[in-house]
Amino acid sequence: MTTPPPLSPPSDWIMQQAQNWPDGARILDFAAGGGRHCCTLDHAFPGRFSFVAIDRDHAALAALKARCPQIEICQFDLEDTNIWGFADDGFDIVIVANYLYRPRLDDLFGLVRQGGYLAYETFATGNEAFGHPSNPDFLLQDGELAARLPDDFTILDYFHGRIDQPKPAIIQRLAAKRQPRNF
């Protein structure tokens, strides 16, 4: 059996957000790649959460499964225009890191259950000065995520600016909670 390649370090910010998430939460790691967030969270908080990792990259998901066999994986083209078949009842928490596809943002927000959380961190305008990504299609404008959130989300944390670790970049972070329905 081949040992999977080492993971890149997880986002410290996402790890901090996880400290506030409820026990027993079902978490979707969206565009999970090799599992740097779901695997690290699963090891940091053993038995506290259950995970579904989705990505289109079969090799990355195979490495994730070898590393963390208890995590459910789903290979799917995240930019497919068909209805997503992996999200029948949504998730308590949705994690997105270093991924942006604007045409599906509304669908992505819809994956968060009522009372659930969204933790989104990706590159933003200005990152061109630091290299990849530099294509505007993959860079958020300041305030863009907040402006796109449905009205039933409350923003808990927001940042748009430069970071220096793990390497210099311009990023945007948004943590939000979807409000429970009022019956």
Model-identified regions with their sequence ranges:
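S-adenosyl-L-methionine
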Residues: 1-22
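Conserved class I S-adenosyl-L-methionine
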Residues: 24-33
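Conserved SAM-binding loop of SAM-dependent methyltransferases across substrates and taxa
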Residues: 34-46
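Conserved SAM-binding motif I beta-strand of class I
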Residues: 50-55
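Conserved SAM/SAH-binding beta-strand->alpha-helix loop
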Residues: 57-59
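A short acidic, Gly/Pro-enriched loop at the edge of an enzyme's catalytic core
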Residues: 84-93
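A short, conserved alpha-helix within the catalytic core of class I
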Residues: 100-109
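Conserved beta-strand signature within the Rossmann-like core of class I S-adenosyl-L-methionine
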Residues: 116-126
